[in-house]
Amino acid sequence: MASDEGKLFVGGLSFDTNEQALEQVFSKYGQISEVVVVKDRETQRSRGFGFVTFENIDDAKDAMMAMNGKSVDGRQIRVDQAGKSSDNRSRGYRGGSAGGRGFFRGGRSRGRGFSRGGGDRGYGGGRFESRSGGYGGSRDYYASRSQGGSYGYRSSGGSYRDSYDSYATHNE
């Protein structure tokens, strides 16, 4: 991970900007170990962003502060730490998995609704859950409901126990 510390994401590039142009602009801030302009796999045209990796993290920080918002080949560029940018993206994905937690809560209330014979109550819980669950949570919830409802939930619990028991036997 230490090798990515001096790596900068450079976005908003002109499609005409190449590695040499980026290196020329950024090299005044310090020793550069790598410059990559990301290209489309089929057309080999620039996709409008790239990465500049500095040998020294302090040089990278100086370059980021100085170059963010500046113009290169007629386009205003955005410069950010490469690691920070991908952290934000992965945090977004993890946030999407909150739908899984929503399903678990929905599963419990559905069980309660089922034992009282209140199918509508379970459905209402689903609607409330989808509102609080946020993105994609409702889709997961309804897809899971359609795959067997409470019985599916219980039987998967049984199969988990079965596989656990067989695992324990093999272990001894």
Swiss-Prot record:
One GO biological process term: stress granule assembly
Outcome (variant: R101K): Inhibits translational repression
Q: What is its main location?
A: nucleus
Question: What keywords were assigned to this record?
Answer: Activator, Cytoplasm, Methylation, Nucleus, Phosphoprotein, Repressor, RNA-binding, Stress response
Phosphoprotein recorded as keyword: yes
Q: Which Pfam families match?
A: RRM_1
Which CDD domains does UniProt cross-reference here?
Answer: RRM_CIRBP_RBM3
According to its UniProt record, in which tissues is this protein expressed?
A: Ubiquitous.
Note the effect listed for R94K.
Inhibits stress granules localization and translational repression
For bias type Gly residues, the affected ranges are 93-105, 114-137
GO CC field: cytoplasm; cytoplasmic stress granule; nucleoplasm; nucleus
Gene3D superfamilies recorded: 3.30.70.330
Q: What is the effect of changing R112K?
A: Inhibits translational repression
- Post-translational modification remark: Methylated on arginine residues. Methylation of the RGG motifs is a prerequisite for recruitment into SGs.
Q: What is the effect of changing R108K?
A: Inhibits translational repression
Query: Locate the RRM domain: which residues?
Result: 6-84
Give the residue ranges for region: Disordered.
Answer: 70-172
- Role this protein plays: Cold-inducible mRNA binding protein that plays a protective role in the genotoxic stress response by stabilizing transcripts of genes involved in cell survival. Promotes assembly of stress granules (SGs), when overexpressed. Seems to play an essential role in cold-induced suppression of cell proliferation. Acts as a translational repressor. Acts as a translational activator. Binds specifically to the 3'-untranslated regions (3'-UTRs) of stress-responsive transcripts RPA2 and TXN.
- Domain description: Both the RRM domain and the arginine, glycine (RGG) rich domain are necessary for binding to the TXN 3'-untranslated region. Both the RRM domain and the arginine, glycine (RGG) rich domain (RGG repeats) are necessary for optimal recruitment into SGs upon cellular stress. The C-terminal domain containing RGG repeats is necessary for translational repression.
Q: How does it assemble?
A: Interacts with EIF4G1. Associates with ribosomes.
Q: What is the protein name for this chain?
A: Cold-inducible RNA-binding protein
Q: Which gene encodes it?
A: Cirbp
